[in-house]
Each structure stands twice: as structure tokens, then as C-alpha cells.
UniProtKB/Swiss-Prot annotation:
UniProt source species: Aspergillus fumigatus (strain ATCC MYA-4609 / CBS 101355 / FGSC A1100 / Af293)
Active-site residues, record numbering mapped to chain: 225
Keyword Iron-sulfur listed: no
Enzyme Commission number: 3.2.1.21
Glycosylated residues in this chain: 197, 493
Record's catalysed reaction(s): Hydrolysis of terminal, non-reducing beta-D-glucosyl residues with release of beta-D-glucose
Domain PA14 residues, every copy: 395-555
Record's keyword terms, sorted: Carbohydrate metabolism, Cellulose degradation, Glycoprotein, Glycosidase, Hydrolase, Polysaccharide degradation, Secreted
Name under which the protein is recorded: Probable beta-glucosidase I
Gene that this sequence comes from: bglI
Principal EC category: hydrolase
InterPro entries tied to this protein: Cellulose_deg_GH3, Fn3-like, Glyco_hydro_3_AS, Glyco_hydro_3_C, Glyco_hydro_3_C_sf, Glyco_hydro_3_N, Glyco_hydro_3_N_sf, Glycoside_hydrolase_SF
Family stated for the protein in its record: Belongs to the glycosyl hydrolase 3 family.
């Protein structure tokens, strides 16, 4: 790669070459123009790790804690480090652009991708995203803020019209993008799938050009979300530089014709191409060649960072009687469906093949010096657990053979064209290629051998984008090849899981074969704009058991053990791109199991893993409760570090946890109704709503405990004289002394809130405006400083003037942290002023 003379290159490009540059050539790469030294660039997801170019059988990658976990750290320095490692992982995968971070707003606990965004509050989300992007882009890799804007649900996400007031859009949904860009002007922005107030964002000139480019002065590249382009002229004229993925659906000859007929002017094309070429120059110093090989890093220092991030994200919600930290020398009983499951990431674009994973059970067992006992408690899978890791090949290797043919099994003389060895029995074949396969229609036989450890009836399940028949010792057990039903897996393209059962004997080996036909062999009506090539498969199995039997056994064991910890929650099956949750509840049986174990042993520690809030009807019984999120590669070690006191928890909730779903402000206005969703709660998202109506959530935004105690004192506040025009340069500086009054070293998160004066418009009771994190030894005192611009601390969006309004009056400053102590001060705004810009 070489630095391009952008203006000269634009002059030398033909119209056809310009058109080609504005669309991808495949799922991850942009077009090249070799004669002008314009190479193809590679992009890669994304939200919590750099997957590379392959969903199927790809190169493993580092998996970071999910965004809500990182949001819980409230730690800008950590987010910067995470961003740098993300950049280094991207370079290892030969990718010039990372498709992240996601900074949408969790207006509902049910959003399928809620775990991908940092927080319900724009200040927390935007500041963390800015430091993450700063770290990432300092490696030379381009960051992509997404999904711009109001992409806050999965239901009908390609078509839904988000009806939102401009005030709410500015104060809630655009704010994290605005604040992130004040810290780091990212190289890229990705548009949302949805419409906003009647127009798809990818062709919404007001959002892309008027606000993003003109008002905020941003000059990077705007790309569509994958298959999120819906027009030729409207999108190009609105400011959408790049349609992804390729091959193009809307550009190509259609765009060339539009330019020749002045539906889109060539000078507009030049603007689009200019932004694409500027991106080339931004990433050129990386020196990543076209089609670079993908490598794994997995360095010890990276593992240490991932472990620290996992531990620092764990929120200590309750700790009555100082049950925590646990004693390493004492025996411990580990219970629950998440104990031996590595719930390390959510589903969809966030999913990847991690270098390794550590389950909570493994993390606890590695640190305990006493006996570690396990009880299942309950099973919480949505689909049957993957069978692949339990299989052996005919030559004794873990996993199964994956044999590819161009002809179906009914063809007696078909020729084997490819054979792979796989361990995961879930595969998305969108990027599988072989030179002898010319179409999306081909067939795969997957064969392995299963030796059960227990007698019993075993249930087998098959989910496909395509067709599938599962045989056990040549007996057809599951037929998912006809009368198929649409399900939610694999971005909503797959069937529901079809099941069958067979009685098996312990110690006996059975041959298991899945005969799979790719997507074109399915009889489902697969209408929709997103088509993922050959499709995919998933097959699982489990011994049929009684949940009541499991719960009773767990409760009995808990009554006999002094140290007990439950690991429960959700997994990537329950929280994933492609669909929203129907409710906030834990999987069936989990609440009953937790409640009965707590009755048997009230000192039981409960650890919940989920990316977004869940109901906890047993919370009043729990003396010790932690929220542990999806913690990445090192989730099990990170949780164990907190349980045993190696790490003193400091995390705070980045989301409000309502008592019940009906309490959340979007309850009446979530999901699409006849093609639209009304953002009826307006600016009252999350804590803004609960505080305004004086409704206590189960656990509030910003809550989190520590193994030590802190005090805050000596609050001082300094402002600068007001200028005629409100702009940057009028900082409010808040200084406070923080003391560790306990006996354990730990970190405190100091939160700065501002409460507005009474005005003629409804405003929240208070809003978060800044925060900082400080580490203190026992007895140590440090002064911390939080600086926020007056315009950001005081303003609301005036829809009549179409400007931010900073109204005169007395503004109260509140400083909070761990515990109930609140320090207060105030400052004056002498004159009402209005402003626009970043």
C-alpha cells in the first residue's frame, strides 16, 4: 500500500471505477483498483473480538468481555487498553477496519443486542467508547462507531420505523456518538438498519450529512450495516459512502446509470470516493497486504488483560454479613447451569471462536484449596447442548468428520470433494468455499461416535438452514428435511430445533451421522434481504432428566455445605443478534432452583451471568449477589478472582435493573407494530424514568459495592466566566477527596451528577455528567478531579430553535460513589444561551 494523492486519484478514476469503489466485493472486503494502486481493504467484526473473515472454522481470536461488562468498569484507562489490544488482534487477522464499538442505547431490557452496547446513559457510553476508539486507532486500525442511530431492537430491524422526537434523539440516542467523537474522531461510522421518522438511516440526509458531517464536522467514511442499503440514488445522495457487503445490490450498473442521467451527480460520487480513499490513507501505515493471512496472538500479556477486564467488570450487588470473599481453604459446592458452561459472549456478530475459555467451575476449582463439589441444579439450554465435543472420530480424535459432496446421499456413486475435522457441531457456512463447489447447493455427511456415561433416554436435536437427518447407528432419529418450521437461530434464517429420542446404554459406542443439505434444499419460504449463502447446521443431545430431581439434589447438598455458590443466567442462545427476548426471566427452572437452594442455605452466593437485566424474584433472600455478564475468554477466572478476594470489586451497574418487565419505561412501546415503534418514553430512558416517577428499580444504575469502604469529602467547584457565545472553553472543575476507610485496597468510582433548575420544560431529576476511577490503599486519601464543559453539563435540545439550550439558573452538583453519601454544591448560569456543534 502507498499513500494516495486523493484529488489526483479522483481525477484519474473512470466512472466505472468510482462506482466499483462504493460497494464491497464480498462479505469483508472493499474493491481494488490496481492500476491506481488502490488496494482492497478488509473489515472484521467487531463488538467483543476480531473474528477475522470466517464464521465457519475460522482462526481463533481473543474474546473480550461484552460491552455491558466493560461499561460496568467505568474505567477509561482499561477501555483504552482494550482498544489497543483490539487493534493488535485486528492486525493479526489482516483487517484494516474493526466494525465496532456498538453504542446504541438499551431502552428496553429485552433488546437482543443490548449486551453489545456499554450503557443506558449516553455520557457513560460515549466517554468509554471514545477511549476505546482512541486506543484502537492508535494502533493504526480504523474504528467504526455503530449503529447510527436508534437501532435498539431486533424485531423487524431492517424495516421498523423508529418514531422518536428530535429532543430524545439528541439527548439520548445521538449523545454517545457525539461524546465519543469529542474524544476520538473515528475513521468510520456504520448506519443503522432501521428507519428514523420515516426514512431509512442509510438514506437519511439529515442524519448522515446535516448532523454527522456538517454540524459535527466529521469527515470519515460512512458504511451501511450488512445488507442495510435500500436504494441507489437516495443513499448515495444522502451521504452513504460504502454499501456492504458485496457483491452490490444497489450500485454497480444501476448507480452508473443514475449518474449518467443526473439522478446522482458525479461530484456527489467524488465525495463518496474521497471518503473511501481517505480511509485507505488512514490505514496505509499498517502495511497490511491484500488478502493477508490470518494469525492468532494469544500472548500471556493479552490473557492477563482479558482476565483483569473480566474481574473488574463483576458487580458486587449484595454482600450482607460479609459473606464474600470466600475462604480458599474451605470446601465449596458449585451449583448451576452456568457453572460448567463458558458463557463468554452473546450471539450473532459478537460470536467468535475464542482461543480458549474458562468456565466458572474451572475458575473456582483452580483457586480453591478445599474440596470442590458440583451439582447441576437445573439445565437451562434453549436448544440441546452441542454434541460435537462429546464425539470421537473413527481414528479416536475428539470431534467428528465433515465430508462434503456435490450430490445427495441418494446418489450411490457420489464423489467426496472435501473432508474436515471439526469439534463444534454448530456451523454457519456463509463463508465456506471449495473450488469444486460452484453453487450454494451441496451436501455434507457429519460422522462421529458417541459413548454415553449413563444409561437413559437421550434427546437429539437438529437445527438447520437447509435440511438435516440425524441417524444413530443407522436409525433415523431426527428428520428436519420436510414440513420445516421457521425459527430464530442463525440471524432468524434457521428452522426450529426438531427433536427425536433413543434409549442408550452407558459405555456402548454409537455411530452418529447428520446428513445435511445446504440452504437451497430447504422447503422454507426464505424471503428477506439477508441470505447467508449455503446456510448452516446445529446438532445436539442430552440425557433426559427430571428438573425436580436435579433441584432437590442441589438443595440437599447445599444444606450440608457451608460454602455454596450458584452460577445461573443466560448464554448466547438467549441473548443474540437476530431476535429480542420475550421476557426478562431466567431460563425455566432457574428461579425455583435458586430460591430452594437459598432456603436450604441462606449464605449461598448467587452469581448471575447475562448481558442485560433479568428478573430476580429471589433477590430478597440472597445475602451475596454478583452480576458477572458475559466475561470473555477469562470469564471463569475473572469471577473466581472476585469471589476469593484476589480482586476487590469496584464495578457499577451501567444499566438499571427493574423489579419486573412492566416497570421499565419502554414496556408499552417495544417491538414493531405494523412497521413502526414509538419511542414513547421520550428522554426518560433508564434511571431518568425511575427517578422522575419515583419508582425504585430492583438495583439502580450506578450501584455496586466493594470489600472495603470509602468516604468522600472536601467538595470544591470552579467555573470560568461566561462568554457571549456558549462553546468549549467554559469548564466546570469538580474536585473531591476520596478516602479508603476500610482494611482492603480497592478502587472507587466517583460519579458527577447535575440537577437542573426549574424551567418551562420537563427535565430529568438529575443526569450523569462525568466520572472517574481512583485506586486507594487502606487509609489512603487522594484528591480527584472531574472536568466537564458547561454546555454539556447544562443543555437540553430545544426543538423550536433546533439548537441546544443552556438556560439560566442555579444548577445543583451531586457527587456520589459507593454507599449512600452524597456531596452537594452548585453553580450559576447567568444567561440563557444556545449552541450547535460537537
Amino acid at each position: 500500500m502507498v499513500q494516495l494523492d486523493v484529488e489526483k486519484t479522483i481525477e484519474e478514476l473512470t466512472l466505472g471505477e468510482k462506482v466499483a469503489l462504493t460497494a464491497g466485493i464480498d462479505f469483508w472486503h472493499t474493491a481494488a483498483v490496481p492500476r491506481l494502486n488502490i488496494p482492497s481493504l478488509r473489515m472484521s467484526d467487531g463488538p467483543n473480538g476480531v473474528r477475522g473473515t470466517r464464521f465457519f472454522n475460522g482462526v481463533p481470536a481473543a474474546c473480550f468481555p461484552c460491552a455491558t461488562a466493560l461499561g460496568a468498569t467505568w474505567d477509561t484507562k482499561l477501555l483504552y487498553e482494550v482498544g489497543r489490544l483490539m487493534g493488535e488482534e485486528s492486525i493479526a487477522k489482516g483487517a484494516h477496519v474493526v466494525l465496532g464499538p456498538t453504542i446504541n442505547t438499551q431502552r428496553s431490557p429485552l433488546g437482543g443486542r443490548g449486551f453489545e452496547s456499554f450503557a443506558e446513559d449516553g455520557v457513560l457510553s460515549g466517554i468509554l467508547a471514545g477511549h476505546y476508539c482512541k486506543g484502537l486507532q492508535e494502533t493504526g486500525v480504523a474504528a467504526t462507531l455503530k449503529h447510527f442511530v436508534c437501532n435498539d431492537q431486533e424485531h423487524e430491524r431492517l424495516a421498523v420505523d423508529s418514531i422518536v422526537t428530535m429532543r430524545a434523539m439528541r439527548e439520548i440516542y445521538l449523545l454517545p456518538f457525539q461524546l465519543a467523537m469529542r474524544i476520538c474522531k473515528t475513521a468510520c461510522v456504520m448506519t443503522a438498519y432501521n428507519k428514523v421518522n420515516g426514512t431509512h438511516v442509510s438514506e437519511n440526509k439529515q442524519i448522515i450529512t446535516d448532523i454527522l458531517r456538517k454540524e459535527w464536522g466529521w469527515d470519515g467514511l460512512v458504511m451501511s450495516d450488512w445488507f442495510g442499503t435500500y436504494s441507489t440514488c437516495d443513499a448515495i445522495n444522502a451521504g452513504l459512502d460504502l454499501e456492504m457487503p458485496g457483491p452490490t445490490r444497489w450500485r454497480g450498473t444501476a448507480l452508473a446509470h443514475a449518474v449518467s442521467s443526473n439522478k446522482a451527480f458525479e461530484f456527489v460520487m467524488d465525495e463518496r470516493v474521497r471518503n473511501i480513499l481517505n480511509l485507505h490513507n488512514f490505514v496505509e501505515p499498517l502495511g497490511i497486504p491484500e488478502n493477508a493471512p490470518e494469525k492468532a496472538l494469544n500472548r500471556p500479556e493479552d490473557q492477563a488483560l482479558l482476565r483483569r477486564a473480566a474481574a473488574e467488570s463483576v458487580v458486587l450487588i449484595k454482600n450482607q454479613d460479609n459473606i464474600l470473599p470466600l475462604k480458599k481453604e474451605k470446601p465449596i459446592l458449585v451449583i448451576g447451569p452456568n457453572a460448567k458452561t463458558a458463557a463468554y459472549c452473546g450471539g450473532g456478530s459478537a460470536s467468535l471462536d475464542a482461543y480458549y475459555t474458562v468456565t466458572p467451575f474451572e475458575g473456582v476449582a483452580a483457586q480453591s484449596q478445599g474440596e470442590v463439589t458440583f451439582s447441576q441444579g437445573v439445565y437451562s439450554y434453549k436448544e440441546l447442548p452441542l454434541l460435537g465435543p462429546l464425539l470421537k472420530t473413527d481414528d479416536g480424535k475428539k470431534g467428528f468428520k465433515f465430508r462434503v459432496y456435490n450430490e445427495p446421499p441418494s446418489e450411490p456413486n457420489r464423489q467426496l470433494i472435501d473432508e474436515l475435522h471439526l469439534e463444534s457441531s454448530s456451523g454457519f457456512l456463509m463463508d465456506y468455499k471449495h473450488p469444486k463447489i460452484k453453487t450454494f447447493t451441496f451436501y455434507v455427511d457429519m460422522e462421529g461416535y458417541f459413548t454415553p456415561e449413563e444409561d437413559g433416554i437421550y434427546d437429539f436435536g437438529v437445527t438447520v438452514v437447509g435440511t438435516g437427518k440425524l441417524f444413530v447407528d443407522d436409525e433415523l432419529v431426527v428428520d428436519n428435511s420436510k414440513n420445516q418450521r421457521q425459527g430464530t437461530a442463525m440471524f432468524g434464517n434457521a428452522t426450529v430445533e426438531e427433536k427425536g429420542s433413543k434409549e442408550l446404554k452407558a459405555g456402548q459406542t454409537y455411530k452418529v451421522v447428520l446428513q445435511f443439505g445446504t440452504a437451497p434444499t430447504s422447503d422454507l419460504d426464505m424471503r428477506g434481504v439477508v441470505i447467508f449463502g449455503p446456510g448452516g447446521f446445529r446438532f445436539g443431545a442430552a440425557r433426559r432428566v427430571s428438573q425436580e430431581e436435579l433441584i432437590s439434589k442441589a438443595a440437599e447438598l447445599a444444606s450440608q455445605t457451608s460454602q455454596v455458590v450458584i452460577f445461573a443466567g443466560l448464554t448466547s442462545e438467549w441473548e443474540t443478534e437476530g431476535y429480542d427476548r420475550d421476557h426478562m426471566d431466567l431460563p425455566p427452572g432457574s428461579d425455583e432452583m435458586i430460591s430452594r437452594v437459598l432456603d436450604a442455605n441462606p449464605d449461598t452466593v448467587v452469581v448471575i451471568q447475562s448481558g442485560t437485566p433479568v428478573t430476580m424474584p429471589w433477590a430478597h433472600k440472597a445475602k451475596a449477589l454478583l452480576q458477572a455478564w458475559f466475561g470473555g475468554n477469562e470469564c471463569g477466572n475473572g469471577i473466581a478472582d472476585v469471589l476469593y478476594g484476589n480482586v476487590n470489586p469496584a464495578a457499577k451497574l451501567p444499566l438499571s435493573f427493574p423489579v419486573r418487565l412492566q416497570d421499565n419505561p419502554s414496556y408499552l412501546n417495544f417491538r414493531s407494530e405494523r412497521g413502526r415503534v414509538l419511542y414513547g418514553e421520550d428522554i426518560y430512558v433508564g434511571y431518568r424514568y425511575y427517578e422522575k416517577v419515583d419508582l425504585a428499580p430492583l438495583f439502580p444504575f450506578g450501584h455496586g459495592l466493594s470489600y472495603t469502604t470509602f468516604s468522600r469529602s472536601d467538595l470544591s467547584l470552579a467555573t470560568t466566566p461566561e462568554k457571549p457565545q456558549l462553546e468549549d472553553g467554559e469548564p466546570i472543575t469538580v474536585t473531591v477527596s476520596v478516602t479508603n476507610t476500610g482494611s482492603v485496597a480497592g478502587a472507587e468510582i466517583v460519579q458527577l451528577w447535575v440537577a437542573p433548575p426549574p424551567t418551562g420544560v420537563n427535565r430529568p431529576v438529575r443526569e450523569l455528567k462525568g466520572f472517574t476511577k481512583v485506586f486507594l490503599q487502606p487509609g489512603e486519601t487522594k484528591k480527584v478531579e472531574i472536568v466537564v464543559e458547561k454546555k454539556l453539563a447544562t443543555s437540553w435540545w430545544d426543538e423550536q430553535r433546533e439548537k441546544w439550550a443552556s438556560e439560566k439558573g442555579t444548577y445543583e452538583v451531586l457527587v456520589t460513589g459507593t454507599g449512600d453519601e452524597v456531596l452537594k454544591s452548585s453553580f450559576e448560569v447567568e444567561k440563557t444561551r444556545y449552541w450547535l456543534g460537537l
